[in-house]
Structures are given as structure tokens and as C-alpha cells.
Amino acid sequence: MTAFNVVRFRVKPGRENQFVDEHRKAKSDFPGLRHAALVKTGERTYCLVGEWDDMSSIVGAREGMIALLDRFRDTLEDLGGGLGVTDPVSGEVVLDLKR
């Protein structure tokens, strides 16, 4: 069943170009990843949205996704509330509204 992951970020002042460039250079060839997009949601805030074949594909890619995060972790601000520099969520699609 199709699954999505969404990761929320807040970038340090003056580091947005580096943050976006690291995503541009990234090899997003994780098995099961259908589509991924980096979305600017506000001033210095972004979400990465990934569409996957299934939850097991997301689980299998976690190590690689963490390695990718480590390349630009220093560009990120702590989100507070014990979250650290990312706020990730993932889950299976329960209703496909439009294709």
C-alpha cells in the first residue's frame, strides 16, 4: 500500500541556499521512492514530502535518509519541544483523493 513520509525543517538564517543545494545534489534513488519534493512552507521553513511504494520501503531507506540528513544537519535550527532539527512523520495512504 502506498505510503508517504513528511519531514519538517527550519533552516538557520543565511543557510537556505546551502540547504536547497544539498537537496538538489542528493541522489534520491532509494528503492521504492516514487516521488519526492522539497516544499517551502514559510520563512526559513520547509517540508520534504516523499511518496513510496509502501512502509517497508521507508523503513529500508531510513539509514540512507539519515546519512543524507547528516550532510546538511548543520544548516538546521532546533525546532524546540524536544524534536531536534527535524519533525518526521510517515504512514500509509488510507484514502487516495485524486490521481
Question: Which sequence ranges carry the predicted segments?
Answer:
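Active-site-flanking beta-strand signature of metal-NTP-handling nucleotidyl enzymes
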Residues: 3-9, 47
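Short catalytic/ligand-binding loop motif for oxyanion handling, primarily in non-cytosolic enzymes
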Residues: 45-46, 58
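Short, surface-exposed ligand-recognition loops at beta-strand->loop->(often short) alpha-helix junctions
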Residues: 8-19
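Short, low-order "capping/linker" segments at domain edges
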Residues: 87-99
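Non-catalytic surface loops within mature trypsin-like serine protease
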Residues: 11-13, 54, 95
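An amphipathic, aromatic/His-enriched active-site/gating alpha helix that lines ligand/cofactor pockets
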Residues: 24-35, 51-87
